Amino acid sequence: MTQNADEYANFKVIRSYVNSIFDWAEELEYIETNHLSKTISRIKATKKIKLQESKKDEDIYLSQEELQAWFTAFEKDLETEKILSKDYVLFYTTFFLGDRKSESYALQWKHINTKEQEIKLVQALDKYKNPKSTKGNKKTTFRIPNELTDLLQEWKKQQKIELAKFNIIQTPEQYVFTYIDTKGNVNSCLHADYLNNKMKSVKRRHPELAHATPHKLRHTGATLAKKAGVSLEAISEALTHSDTITTKIYVNTSNVIPMAVGEIAFRNFKK
């Protein structure tokens, strides 16, 4: 099995199959008990680990220059009406918070206090657009900068006008980001790939941009924050990780978070 771990990137699947066979044998009473279970579980997926370690930095996060280019591209597309204000604000929000896109999708106006400049992350959306707990069931309050506060205030006003056209009243329960889906349903929650698709469309119009995804933005904020001298513990807290071990994967080199990792990165390339 150890040799297989060195040869196959999908070793976890193989390990699971082998364990299932012995569990089944135990169930059918061919063996007294599955003595191999703990032994097998201790064999690490070394091939997969090596592949992850061999990934180039540019495949994992954006440099400051590349990130700046993405912001510029979004600004240009907004000015030329190639994207909607909602899409621009969604991109900004997801980067600044350094959150999971499903958590941005699940934001409701009751979670945003522009007066106190705070956003509470308390839920996410599953692939069926239903609310679920955040990863680890964490509830986190982020302090947000003036730039994001202003964008959210403007978008809230605009959304209220747009919803009124369909006789929908904007309430605190209203989701911050919604759209008209392919079936014509108005005020529908965003589907899982919504932000990915918007970023792809921006990339098509600006082919010079480095490849990026919402998850890569999360890696970028964490890595640039680390390069700016922020401690691993502070980044771990801002990313709502349960420990710094998970955070090390990201940085590659109700908690209240005073400055999200995205803002730290943003401040540095604005200097």
Task: Explain the meaning of each model-derived region.
Residues 19-22, 26, 254-258:
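C-terminal flanking helix
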Residues 28-37, 113-116, 156-168:
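Proline-centered turn/helix-capping motifs that create local helix->coil transitions or kinks
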Residues 75-84, 160-168, 172, 182-189, ...:
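Short, basic (Lys/Arg/His-rich) helix/loop patches that form interaction surfaces
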Residues 125, 239-264:
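Catalytic-site neighborhood detector that most strongly recognizes the C-terminal catalytic loop/helix
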Residues 60, 130-154, 171-199:
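C-terminal catalytic core of Y-nucleophile DNA break-rejoin enzymes
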Residues 4, 8-16, 27, 31, ...:
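Basic, Lys/Arg- and aromatic-enriched nucleic-acid-binding interface segment
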Residues 111-118, 230-251:
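Short, polar N-cap/turn motifs at the start of nucleic acid-interacting alpha helices
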Residues 41-45, 107-157, 161:
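Conserved tyrosine-mediated DNA breakage-rejoining catalytic core shared by Y-recombinases
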